[in-house]
């Protein structure tokens, strides 16, 4: 049986979780005329326009451009699937928990589009010469920002409210799991060069911390999406609490060790960006080693805060079997 999560008081509500006072109509074209349906149409159109503008001029060279193009295409495709399921009333036949899947995707999509809206103009668009390609790239960035706001709005509308019975992924800890795994993926992208950490066992430990915490958080998300939380040998609430506490402790060590061994000269670090020859001049589609080290340090702090908030909010959840 699936696990449903509520906040302190268990109540039943027939109104939509968007708080707009009317339920989402499914299995009918009228689903598109409801506020949530219209919002998803905006998501669909904005991501479609973004990747179409870039594709029409081939403005996605390099890893950063490829990431942005993947983001828009992926978000468009999954949003289209969600709309089709809603229109045809196929929620019961969907292989994943419909109570958890849409908001999980919306949260990921908001983060994906946010990253594309920042990475694409800063690492790609600014290096384009003035002309049609640059104009299309700037317009694509604008529509990417619209998509980000639209997905974030869906998360705000459909997240759990106090006293409401809902899926775990709609709660604050569930949404924080999405943030934690997303930030970890960005960290992995920045440490893709083994030369950043292989020279020090302490830095290798940090990489192990990122991997362990990512895997545990991903398992929690997948168990909820697959509605198979009962397969664990321990109660699911205990698993979540232990996961959050362990992750806080592990990330605390990484937050100390990573900056210490990357930026302190006594431990072989490089305190000044000017000393890194790879940062001596601007490169299109490339982030120099010192900037990567700094980005990982900042992202480590962000994820530690996310895990602390996760641990605190998890104590306020009440789990019931349905």
Curated annotation (Swiss-Prot):
PROSITE patterns: MARVEL. Residues 31-163, 168-319 form the MARVEL domain. The modification Phosphoserine is found at residue 22. It is found in: Membrane. Residues 1-21 are annotated as: Disordered. Pfam families: MARVEL. One of its GO terms (cellular component) is ruffle. This is Myeloid-associated differentiation marker. The lineage of its organism: Eukaryota, Metazoa, Chordata, Craniata, Vertebrata.
């Amino acid at each position: 049986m699936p696990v449903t999560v509520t906040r302190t008081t268990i109540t039943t509500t027939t109104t939509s979780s968007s708080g707009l006072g009317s339920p989402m109509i499914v299995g009918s074209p009228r689903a598109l005329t409801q506020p949530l349906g219209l919002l998803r149409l905006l998501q669909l159109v904005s991501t479609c326009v973004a990747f179409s503008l870039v594709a029409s001029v081939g403005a996605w060279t390099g890893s950063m451009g490829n990431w942005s193009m993947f983001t828009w295409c992926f978000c468009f495709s999954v949003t289209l699937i969600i709309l089709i399921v809603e229109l045809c009333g196929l929620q019961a036949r969907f292989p994943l928990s419909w109570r958890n899947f849409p908001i999980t995707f919306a949260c990921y999509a908001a983060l994906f589009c946010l990253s594309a809206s920042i990475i694409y103009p800063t690492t790609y668009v600014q290096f384009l010469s003035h002309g049609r390609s640059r104009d299309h790239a700037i317009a694509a960035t604008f529509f990417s920002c619209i998509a980000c706001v639209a997905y974030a709005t869906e998360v705000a509308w459909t997240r759990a409210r106090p006293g409401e019975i809902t899926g775990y992924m709609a709660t604050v800890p569930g949404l924080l799991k999405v943030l934690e795994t997303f930030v970890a993926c960005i960290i992995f992208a920045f440490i893709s060069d083994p030369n950043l950490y292989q020279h020090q066992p302490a830095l290798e430990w940090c990489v192990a911390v990122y991997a362990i915490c990512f895997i545990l958080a991903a398992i929690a998300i997948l168990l909820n999406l697959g509605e198979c939380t009962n397969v664990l040998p321990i109660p699911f609430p205990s698993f979540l609490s232990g996961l959050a506490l362990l992750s806080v402790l592990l990330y605390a060590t990484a937050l100390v060790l990573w900056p210490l061994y990357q930026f302190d000269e006594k431990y072989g670090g490089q305190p000044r960006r000017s000393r890194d020859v790879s940062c001596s001049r601007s490169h299109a589609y490339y982030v120099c080693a010192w900037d990567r080290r700094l980005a990982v340090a900042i992202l480590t702090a962000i994820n530690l805060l996310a895990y602390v908030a996760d641990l605190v909010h998890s104590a306020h959840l009440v789990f019931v079997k349905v």
